[in-house]
Amino acid sequence: MNVSANDLAGLKVMVIDDSKTIRRTAETLLKKEGCEVLTAVDGFEALAKISDQKPAIIFVDIMMPRLDGYQTCALIKNNPQFRATPVIMLSSKDGLFDKARGRIVGAEQYLTKPFTRDELLGAIHRHVSTVSNH
């Protein structure tokens, strides 16, 4: 996939994961592409930041304490202001059940961890319509 260096410049991307390693990996990859990266360790922290920062796309881990990825996604999708914001589920399991459950709560896509740079950027290009002209 040939992605020009700055077509993602300034795009706000949120990564919600209780793993510091995953947050850091995603943040490093995305910042290289010029994205503005917001991170949160769980759904509660994320929801406060989402209403404040209004990211263009949200990556959320499924397995998190307090509020898991499914609950977080459902809360985002139940808010009329953020219903159209694409949510990509992240999971270390590649199960059909998890993918189906992700679709039920309104997730746009499901990525298996560890994800690659191309998978991460591919998801953004697939779901953020303003990427090439924002």
Regions found by a protein language model. Name each.
Residues M64:
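Receiver (REC) domain active-site loop signature in two-component systems and cognate sites
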Residues Q53-F59:
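Active-site beta3 strand of CheY-like receiver
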Residues M1-K12, D118-H134:
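Non-catalytic signal-transmission and effector/linker regions of two-component phosphorelay proteins
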Residues R24-K32:
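Charged docking surfaces used in two-component/phosphorelay signaling
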Residues G34-V41, K49:
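Short hydrophobic/Thr-rich beta-strand motif most characteristic of the beta2 strand and flanking loop
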